[in-house]
From Swiss-Prot:
Family per record: Belongs to the L-ribulose-5-phosphate 3-epimerase family.
Record-level Gene Ontology MF annotations: DNA binding; intramolecular oxidoreductase activity, interconverting aldoses and ketoses; L-ribulose-5-phosphate 3-epimerase activity; zinc ion binding
Pfam families noted in UniProt: AP_endonuc_2
Presence of the UniProt keyword Phosphoprotein in the record: no
Keyword field contains Ubl conjugation: no
Catalyzed reaction equations: L-ribulose 5-phosphate = L-xylulose 5-phosphate
GO biological-process terms attached to the record: DNA repair; L-ascorbic acid metabolic process
Note: Probably part of a sugar metabolic pathway along with SgbH.
Record's protein name: Putative L-ribulose-5-phosphate 3-epimerase SgbU
Length: 286
């Protein structure tokens, strides 16, 4: 068994293909798992209403391919956030959470990544933060009962821009089912002290997103996606060296949005090769 598994985000693979094809392509490209996306689009939200036969079909494809789907990126809460002042939207956010946990149980998904936004399209204030806390408490109660882990991603907005900021919520929620899902690109873009941040959260890190970013500065808002590996602000060798020092044993997920590109498979193969090279330089072999 490999020490560290490397997976690929669903949105890096061609979009209009079957799940059986998606799993087979991920395997052919050298990945061990896929992270499923349940985003704010109606198309991907509809997966929460899959029939029993549709769920069984995907489960069989997982077993046949040997490629698992251990995690779900639940970014649908950007459109339907826990912190919304609209009661109907909050009710929808709870419904999405319930259905996401149910789907996870059926498919063997063990970790649901939550977006660290109280609201995204609304203005934040004390009320939205209060509603966000109520939503997280509700979600963790359900997840714990189903033995599904919830992991909050370090985000592209100040609200959850560091593990330090997440740690406040960890203290409030106080549950082993509430963890953190660092995105090394986002963590770096906010000019955090990477060693201090990783050390603070190492005992609650469920998995790690790998991507490059451009930093936030006094004159720039930064860039949080679609930055080619090696061209941004992330010091990957230093990052992997720190994880080796901290004895991190979890998985890595390469996060890319190449599903509509002309040669997405070539891009993800090259990305994986580059990441492995950085790991080898740091002595963190896969």
């Amino acid at each position: 068994m490999k020490k560290h598994k490397i997976g690929i985000y669903e949105k890096a693979l061609p979009k209009n293909i079957t799940w059986q094809e998606r799993l087979s392509l991920a395997k052919a490209c050298g990945f061990e798992f896929i992270e499923m996306s349940i985003d704010e689009s109606n198309d991907r939200l509809s997966r929460l209403n899959w029939t029993k036969s549709e769920r069984i079909a995907l489960h069989q494809s997982i077993i046949q391919s040997g490629i698992t789907i251990p995690s779900m990126c639940l970014s649908a809460h950007r459109r339907f956030p826990f912190g919304s002042k609209d009661k109907k939207i909050r009710q929808k956010s709870f419904e999405i959470m319930e259905k996401a946990i149910d789907l996870s149980v059926n498919l063997g998904i063990r970790t649901i990544q939550l977006a660290g936004y109280d609201v995204y399209y609304e203005k934040q204030d004390e009320e939205t933060i209060k509603y966000f806390q109520e939503g997280i408490e509700f979600a963790v109660t359900l997840a714990a009962s189903a033995q599904v882990t919830l992991a909050v991603e370090i985000m592209d907005t100040p609200f959850m821009s560091s593990i330090s900021r997440w740690k406040k919520w960890d203290t409030i929620i106080n549950s082993p089912w509430f963890t953190v899902y660092p995105d090394i690109g986002n963590l770096s873009a906010w000019n955090n002290n990477i060693e201090e941040e990783l050390t603070l959260g190492i005992d609650k890190i469920s998995a790690i997103h790998l991507k490059d970013t451009y930093p936030v500065t006094e004159t720039s808002k930064g860039q949080f996606r679609d930055v080619p590996f090696g061209q941004g602000c992330v010091d990957f060798v230093h990052f992997f060296s720190l994880l080796k020092k901290l004895n991190y044993r979890g998985a890595f997920l390469i996060e890319m949005w190449t599903e509509k590109n002309e040669e997405p498979l070539l891009e993800i193969i090259q990305a994986r090769k580059w990441i492995v090279q950085q790991m080898e330089k740091a002595g963190l072999l896969c």
